[in-house]
Amino acid sequence: MKTRNPIVVQRKNGPPRFLHVNFNQDQECFSCATEKGFEIYNTDPIQCSVKRRFSHNGMSGIGYTRMLYRTNYIGLVGGGASPRFSTNKIAIWDDIQQRDSVSIRFNSPVHELFLSRQYIVVVLAQSIDVYTFSGSPSRVCPVISNIHNGIADFVTCSKMRRASGPQDVEHALSQKHVIAGILAYPSGIRPGQIHIADLSNIQTPSVADASATHLPTSIIKAHKNPIHLVKLSPQGTMVATCSVEGTLIRVFSIASGSLIHEFRRGLDRALIYDMQWNGKGDKLAVVSDKFTLHIFQINEDLDKRHLLKGWFPKVKYLQGVWSMCSTKLDRSLLTHDEDTCKVGWIGDEALSLLWQKSGMWEKYVIMEKLREYKVDETLHSGAPDGRRQLYDLVRESWRQL
């Protein structure tokens, strides 16, 4: 006689648990959009900290959420069967006042929303609008047009800027800290190109008119195929890109536009679900519809190159740098066949995965091990005594939310 109930009820392709999930800026917590409102969880240990339910004339659905660190402000966009807000409107929800303190309406649906203490960045299908973060938002610069498919990323970081002054040389060479708002987006005119803009470089004429301002941008030729994802490092110094092919991940320097790393995820075409930098900006996590999670190391020789590299003429498969570690994800626990996930870092040696439709949280830990080198494995250049450091990705825990 069966007396034990299963931990997870397998309901394939039922109603989605969440309509959207998003990590906050430091990845210490995440927000989830639902048909009834939104929820906020601490990443590790996993715990629900906020749960809001709307009941305004039966209109309660939230389709997108974006937190502002751990503050009381949360960006919301309507969604689901009965949207609480229009899909072409953003609402900045004040959780202390229990009301939306700011709302801005657009002519087309909102694809992405980024918040900082200085800016509100709204990404539409083919354009980006930037406003000041205030009770009465004002436009910072003219509308950025000709972007591709509502794809963009935005980070804020501190940087040094040389101050200029007519008084003396010492003052002219002095430096000051400024808050830079780095914006990256693919070109809608030239597939494969991305544009980088720093909002702190906005050139404003004497006339107080946002339409007269100018935002300088730099261009990086990243891929031959259309861009699928761009992800800026937390320090605003590098940008990771992938195309619709999903086989190569490229990392570029924002300052020079030069290629720093080219990583190979695999040979078969794949849909990249998400890419995420760790806090130090020296590791990049990539998860795809092949149900694999890859970790790439930046500026270190910990990634793997193929055993036959250097023995045969240049072949793209052999030349690529592979991940320092990877793992195959267990799809048996998912309650939806076609689910997508977001990845976030817990410190520098652990990660969390959020499965949107299934409402499942997973924690993976990077474990290092030392073992004898085998012929059928990849080589590590400069490994002493035929031994090399290897890393594994191990699932430590999971939970149905």
Swiss-Prot record:
GO CC, alphabetical: cytoplasmic vesicle membrane; cytosol; endosome; fungal-type vacuole; phagophore assembly site membrane; vacuolar membrane
GO biological process, one term: protein localization to phagophore assembly site
Cellular localization per UniProt: Vacuole membrane; Cytoplasmic vesicle membrane
Annotated GO MF terms: phosphatidylinositol-3,5-bisphosphate binding; phosphatidylinositol-3-phosphate binding; phosphatidylinositol-4-phosphate binding; phosphatidylinositol-5-phosphate binding; protein-macromolecule adaptor activity
Topology in the lipid bilayer: Peripheral membrane protein
Principal localisation: membrane
Gene3D superfamilies the record matches: YVTN repeat-like/Quinoprotein amine dehydrogenase
Keywords, ordered alphabetically: Cytoplasmic vesicle, Membrane, Protein transport, Repeat, Transport, Vacuole, WD repeat
Pfam families documented for this protein: PROPPIN (PF21032)
WD repeats: 222-262, 267-306
Known function: Involved in mitochondrial or peroxisomal functions and amino acid signaling pathways.
UniProt family annotation: Belongs to the WD repeat PROPPIN family.
Domain free text: May contain a beta-propeller domain involved in specific binding to phosphatidylinositol 3,5-bisphosphate (PIP2), leading to the association of the protein to the membrane.
Protein name: SVP1-like protein 2
